[in-house]
Structures are given as structure tokens and as C-alpha cells.
């Protein structure tokens, strides 16, 4: 700040007029005003938004304390790695320059259950009242709190009795987590689920898939997951391999305004796309079977509806065929080509089988001698044999239960752990009873 203070003294001298001593009532020194505010260094935000967030205004008195407060205010948002200022005189006023460097870490803001407002309304309100809001908030700083505070203010204006909270939402270790904002304390029971754009599918059957959503409190994040795990597979099973569902749109189900407790109607926008038929796959790479045999394993026939669920199961069966022959690192990469004119889909499948693994040692822990002996007798994958990657699951599901019954053993928990040695290409298997 020493440099800034010296600059201020020099600046002050420019506005001070020297002259002969005057007796009588002293006149006050005229105020120095900010004539313009410039911003440099920014990429994400506009100059106007940064100036608004700083709290500075053109025409206000020039004061160092105000400049210090402005850069501190910018820093507190968390949106900047640093913020500083320069200034110089121009035409009897002061030009202020805010020099910033924006942070790289921002996270998307998601509004989970504000059913009283459209997403557009929320976005417009926050962009107007929180100067740096652009749908995202920095990882550090107070901007997320400012967003929550503005949402709380909006609820109060509408007479809605709910408390706004925000949490970090995402899978453990996921760097792309989101800020999730909730209106806690609001009862928002879903009474209807609609599909906008569902024109060719059997809507009655689709509605049955949506029944689990009824009588639940609305939450965008939960409904997104449900759509991805239920509605998308529903369409793919019927050949709609390029179906797309947008985010659900909630709104009060009744015409009159609701406050805290609302019956909610939810609409999913759907772009169904075409119903595709299967065209024989093109197989490339490390093939351990003939193309004809691979097609049989897939279980698909030319001209039949390209059932996405059946196709996924077919590729899983092909993978298991490689596992059965010891290729447990196999990589199967299907690439789709859609012919919208013929309404067909062709998969070009590249296979890299990787190394072949062999069986190492079988370890049995926590068992009686009788059970240990029985399992060793039943286990057919011997040391040195090609390791069957499917066998451990099959053995646990079938032979293990048989051995428990024959030895009259009760097991509350069974753990299986294959130990894969990438260097020796050996797999040791441990089975433990707890």
C-alpha cells in the first residue's frame, strides 16, 4: 500500500492550488471524484459485473479506504486469485483500474426443489442481484452464501416458509461436484408425471414406469437419476437408441398459488428419435471365435428391433466368453453408426483381448476342516489352469451353497477376493467365511 499512498499524495498535489495567504473564513478543499473505473485481467466476467461486485461507483468521492474495501470485497467472493487497484488523475477526476486474476475452480449451481419458480426466473433473479453469478460459483469464498441469501429473500417475498440450504453434491472424489440449493421444510408431493414429446411410444406403459415417482417430494437430482436409470432404458429396450430426456420441469399442480405445501406436476421433455433395427456388427481386433459365433453369442438377428437392453446383454456375454478363456483384461469398444434413412444401426466392435491369466492358489479362511475339504474337492480350476474369470461367481452361487448344506455349516457372510498379479499373469483366489 506504500506505493498507492505515495501515488495519492502526488495526485492530491495536482488538485491543490497554491497562492498568497488569504485571511478570513477558510474554504473546504473540493472533493476529488472517481471519473471512470476500468477492469483488466478478466476473462470470465464482464467489466460491468466486476465493478458492480466491487461496490465502486463512478462519481463517488475518491478515497483509498473505498478502494481497499472494493478489492477485499472482490477477494471475498472467491472468484479471483488476486485483486488490486491502480489510479491516476485525468481531467480533474480519478481513473481507477481494478486488476484481477480469476480463479479456475468454479462449480455449477443446481436448484433442487424451488417448484414455485421456473429455472429461468431463478437465473434472472440471481444474475440481477448477485453481480458475478453466471450459473456457477467459485469453490472458495462467499458467493454460494450470497446466492443462498438471495434465494431466501425471494422465498420471504413470496410468503413461502422454507429455509434455503446449500451443500456440496457429488460422488466421493469427484472434482466436478455441484452446489446443490434446497428449500428445506417445504412439502412438495408429486401428483402427476407427464412426458412432453412422447409421440410414438406406448404412453400408458411409460406412465406405469413413472409410478414410483408419485407421492414423493420433488427433488431435481433424484428425478434426473430416475430418468437415466428407468426412462432411458425403457426407450432403448424398444429400439429408441438415440432418445434424449431433458431435465424435468416442476410446477404447482393447481391453479391457485401454493406456499409451503404444494401438489406438484412434473414434466419430462422427450426427444424420442427413431426406432432402429439391428444390422450385423463388424468385428475387428483379437477374435477368439468366428464372426458367426460372435453373432450367436450376441443373440441379435438382422432386421429385429435394436433392443438396447438385449444389445448390452449381448456384449456382456461376449466379454464373459473372453473371461472364460483367461482374458480378464479384455477391452470391447463398440462404435455405433446410425442410418436414419434405413432406420438401422451398425456396431463396429474393436476387441483387444490382453494377456491370458492362469490360476494360482485357492485360499479358504474361517471354515471348518470338513467345509474346507469339501470346497477343495468341488473347486475345479486347479493351479496352472487357464483362469476362468466367471468361475468364482458361479462357484459361490452354486457349489458353495451345496457344500454348506452337506457339512451343515451356517455362514452369515461370505467374502471372495481374486488377487490379480499383472506381472506374473496369475490370479490367486481367497474365499472367507465370517
Regions found by a protein language model. Give the residues of each.
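Positively charged n-region of N-terminal signal peptides that target proteins for export
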Residues: 1-4
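Bacterial N-terminal signal peptides
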Residues: 6-16
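Signal peptide processing junction and immediate N-terminal pro/mature segment
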Residues: 15-27
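Interaction-mediating elements
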Residues: 24-434
